[in-house]
Amino acid sequence: MSIVSMKQLLEAGVHFGHQTRRWNPKMAPYIFTERNGIYIIDLQQTVEKLEQAYEFVKKLVMDGGTILFVGTKKQAQESIKEEAERCGMFYVNQRWLGGTLTNFKTIKTRIQRLKELKRMEEDGTFEVLPKKEVIRLRKEKERLQKFLGGIENMESLPSALFIVDPKKEAIAVSEARALEIPIVAIVDTNCDPELIDYPIPGNDDAIRAVKLITSKIADAVLEGKQGEQFEAAEE
């Protein structure tokens, strides 16, 4: 039983690539045809590659691994947050802060600061501070929450990344590659699939297409978690 049907992929517009002049020749094997100046992605390969990515994610999570969902473009922001939260994983959906992976130690100090500000707000510290100071601290907290909220509970580096549009998230890709962290990604016709361990050829510009594929990766996480609980119960 396939995890996604051709009908679902077609309805979500996963097969629509970019204009033919905006393409990466390395994506040629995943292109089915060209129609009205737009490349059409071979959905049979999308199904195949999505199944491979699904199995990889499921097994990784079953072994106790974690996934960081990354998508900062408008069409991906909501799906990335919703699906990562649904499966209990981490996400970056605003801006990728350089060094999120390669300089994780520094990022962790910013996360600590966010937690400290939240504590101050909750334990009444804000109430005894001067008004101007409180306004400044609240602004700082909101900014940190915006950029780091999705990785607030990420204690160590993730086991893998799931990326929507690796061309846009080039910094995240290069950091993951430098640290040899595997990457699963939706690759459109303008991307370089060779930079990705588990490329899923598909439209990265349509909200429905992004949502469909991201939700399948989240499903893989949830299935992996069930397997992990099952194994723990057997022990």
From Swiss-Prot:
Listed GO biological process terms: translation
GO molecular function: structural constituent of ribosome
InterPro entries: Ribosomal_uS2, Ribosomal_uS2_bac/mit/plastid, Ribosomal_uS2_CS, Ribosomal_uS2_flav_dom_sf
This protein's record includes keyword NADP: no
Record's GO cellular component terms: cytosolic small ribosomal subunit
Organism domain of life: Bacteria
Keywords: Ribonucleoprotein, Ribosomal protein
SUPFAM superfamilies: Ribosomal protein S2 (SSF52313)
Entries under HAMAP family matching the protein: Ribosomal_uS2_B
Family as reported in the entry's similarity comment: Belongs to the universal ribosomal protein uS2 family.
Protein name: Small ribosomal subunit protein uS2
Name of the gene: rpsB
